[in-house]
Amino acid sequence: MKPDHIPFQELTDETLCRLAASGDRVAEERLVMRYNRLVRMCARPYFLAGGDSEDLIQEGMVGLLAAIREYDSSKAAVFRTYAEVCIKNRLFS
C-alpha cells in the first residue's frame, strides 16, 4: 500500500505498477500520464497521410495499459523498457 504522506509523483514506476495491479486507479492514471509522450513517440512513425492518428495513439495506449497490468518487477527489464515493447507490439498487431 502507498503511504498517505508520499505523493504519487515521487513513487517509482515499479511501485505504481504494483499499486495499479492491486486496483489503485489513481496509480494507473499517473502511469498513463507519465508515459503519454512515449506512446505518441512510438506511434508517430506509423501515421499515414489521410489516416487518423488518434486511432494509432489509442492502440498504443492499450499496449501501455497492458504493460501496467502485466509488468513483473522481478524480471530484468525496467518498466519503461517493458512498456515500450508492449506499446510497439500493439502498434504492429
Question: Where are each of the predicted segments found?
Answer:
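Alpha-helical promoter-recognition and RNA polymerase-docking modules of transcription initiation factors
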Residues: 1-93
